[in-house]
């Protein structure tokens, strides 16, 4: 009888231990071209990175494990929930040449991130490159016209993320070489919503996009900020 009890206790302990080992923090990404890769983003999204010849642009990132988000997840025992990154997408609905793009703007993709423990927002670069209007700081009652502007759209984005994923940690990852008004906008808006910023620095690029070295630097800098909040498959 004691032998059976011991075996049963050992089996239960093993199951619990394996369950704990398998538990991983789930990470979702809401991004632009910097976070795309062929076969790893939401179907239908535009890409910039990939392994097939048509994505050979002269950038040395040609394998998914070279991307910043794959390095971040693989190196730190995390799990990818959803990567909803779209090349060329803006946070607001005003895109290149003044085109109205409510279909691929960050604020249009908020509900597609699954059930993340951590949400990583990587945007603003195309808003600057496209010359999207900044607009005013606005924290409620957004109209379609308001969301054509970067500041109201970023406010709306964080508001929706916090309501849609109330238990998820949210990080705003900011590219290098943005105009000062974009950094200032992120600072003010992130402070209002309690969003942690990751302000990137010294990122090597090829054709305006992170190279392998740049991707590794992004992964390292993001983990330096968020790593202290993650322990043994849980966020704190």
Question: What is the predicted function of each stretch?
Answer:
Residues 26-28, 40-135:
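Conserved SGNH/GDSL esterase-like catalytic core that processes O-acyl groups on lipids
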Residues 1-64, 74-75, 112-114, 166, ...:
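N-terminal secretory targeting modules
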Residues 31-33, 85, 176:
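A mature extracytoplasmic/lumenal domain signature
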Residues 37, 90-93, 180, 207:
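Generic structural signal for helix capping and beta-alpha/helix-loop junctions
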Residues 100-236:
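Alpha-helical cap/lid subdomain in secreted, periplasmic
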């Amino acid at each position: 009888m004691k032998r059976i009890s011991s075996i049963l206790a050992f089996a239960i302990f093993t199951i619990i231990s394996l369950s704990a080992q398998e538990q991983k923090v789930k990470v979702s990404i809401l991004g632009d071209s910097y976070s795309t890769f062929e076969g790893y983003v939401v179907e239908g999204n535009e890409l910039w990175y990939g392994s097939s010849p048509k994505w050979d642009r002269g950038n040395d990132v040609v394998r998914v494990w070279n991307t910043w988000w794959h390095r971040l997840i693989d190196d730190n025992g995390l799990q990818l929930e959803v990567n909803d990154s779209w090349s060329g997408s803006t946070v607001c609905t005003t895109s290149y040449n003044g085109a109205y793009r409510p279909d691929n703007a960050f604020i249009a993709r908020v509900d597609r991130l699954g059930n993340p423990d951590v949400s990583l927002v990587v945007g603003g670069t195309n808003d600057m490159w496209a010359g999207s209007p900044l607009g005013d700081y606005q924290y409620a009652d957004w109209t379609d016209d308001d969301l054509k502007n970067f500041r109201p759209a970023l406010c709306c984005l964080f508001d929706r993320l916090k309501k849609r994923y109330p238990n998820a940690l949210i990080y705003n990852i900011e590219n290098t070489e943005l105009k000062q008004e974009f950094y200032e906008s992120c600072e003010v808006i992130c402070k209002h919503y309690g969003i942690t910023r990751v302000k990137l620095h010294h990122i090597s690029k090829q054709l305006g996009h992170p190279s392998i070295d740049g991707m590794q630097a992004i992964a390292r800098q993001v983990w330096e900020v968020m790593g202290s909040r993650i322990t043994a498959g849980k966020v704190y």
